[in-house]
Amino acid sequence: KKHAVIGGLYMVIRGTETGVNLERFVLGALLDDVTRKADVRLSVMSGGRYQLQRARGERVDARKTGGLDLEVMDSYTGKSRVASTLSGGETFLASLSLALGLADVVQEYAGGVHLDSMFIDEGFGSLDQETLDLAMKTLIAMQGQNRMIGIISHVSELEERITTRLRIEKTQRGSIAAFEIDG
C-alpha cells in the first residue's frame, strides 16, 4: 500500500496523467500572479481594451508549453487572441505590463525586498500619441511610488516629458555624458 501511495505521488509530480508536472504547475500559479498585476497596468495603458490571460482550451498543448502561453482578451471584439497577433506598439505595452507585474510579484514574494529601479530600453517609438500618453502616465505614477524609471530612447517626444535626463552623445573622441534637469 505504501508503494502505491508513493507511486501515485510520483505520477502526480511528473504530470503523467495531466501532462503538467509539478514544476509547470507552480510556474503557472506564479504566472497567474504576474498576469493579475500586469493586467492592472495594461488596462490603463490600453485604455481598457486589453487584458492578459493564460491560454486555455484547444490552443494549448500542455505537454509542449506546460500551459504557460498567454492570450489577450480584446474588449473591442469580445474575443481572446494569441499574443503574437498584437501590433508592435501593443506588444511593447503588454511586455512593459508584464515586466512591471513581475517586479510587483517579486517584491511581494521576497518579503521586504524593494525593486526601486527599472530601465526600459526603447519600444516607445512604436506607440501612437494616445498610447504613448497612457504609457507615460503609468510610468509617472510609478515614480510617485518611490520608483526610479530609466528610459533608454531616441524618441524626441519623450525628451519633452522627462524632466531629468542623462544625455549620451557620441563624438570622435568618445562619448560624452551629461545630466540635464528642467526647472
Describe the role of every protein-language-model region.
Residues 1-183:
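Terminal ABC-like ATPase head and other globular end-domains that cap long coiled-coil arms
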